[in-house]
Amino acid sequence: VAGGSDITLQGKVYAQSDVVLGAGSVNVKDGEIRTHRNNADTYADKKAADAYRKQLVNVSPSATVAKALGDGHIALAAVGVSSAEKPFETKGAIVIDKAYIDAAGGDISIASSAERNGGNLMGSKADASVEISNATIQGQNVAISAETKVSGKVGSADAYKTGAEEDGILGLLHATFDEQVGSLASVVKTGADSRVTVKDSTLTAAKDLAISSKAESEIGSETGGALGVGINVGIADVSSKVEIQGTSVLTAEKDLAISAEGSNAIDLQRQGSAEDLPIA
């Protein structure tokens, strides 16, 4: 697991237990991931596990090897982080291209997520994506998801301090009036973008297959401010979609669910008052 960095897999991974890959960006290209799990817990299975452990220890005496086979799950996770080049954007991405992923007796989870707290005039964005093309993915339960959440407060000091780095007027206002400026010219912009794309791929689940995209944006007000006048403006862009393209085939022995959900909430109030503004 490498938080905030990139992982690229182009080789083969054969595991007797679980496989977990986690980073800010996960790429599986021309790669293969297979797992096996101990279903019956029989003497033969235990003996095979013991032999496997001994082989690993012989290769690497310092290796730490599990005493029992795992469930054979496969999990790919991308957790978005911001970068120095784009400090106001949080992005998580998973790309699976020309790959074979098989959890013989376990579940498969492919999840990309991004969360961003604190909006500003220049825009604060969370972006999560899963792109699958020319791939074969099969397991017991298969879940593929992209989820983003972004929030901000209009009139907060943070909005001014962040905006001050990019806008001379806001910087001058904040430097002169500090907290007293309240929401004199307070503008917050946020964006949440989630998407899952499956193209020319085969997805098979012995039980349930679920593909989902969810994007959520919330903008609230920071009440208070000595001046108590001005205008609050909240701008929120939300996009959530699932696309099944080309020759893709989706099969589930039980339930197959595809969903895309987006929510956008803006709650703006007058400075120093609990009364809602008539516009948002």
Short names for language-model regions:
Residues 1-280:
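Low-complexity, glycine- and small/polar-enriched segments
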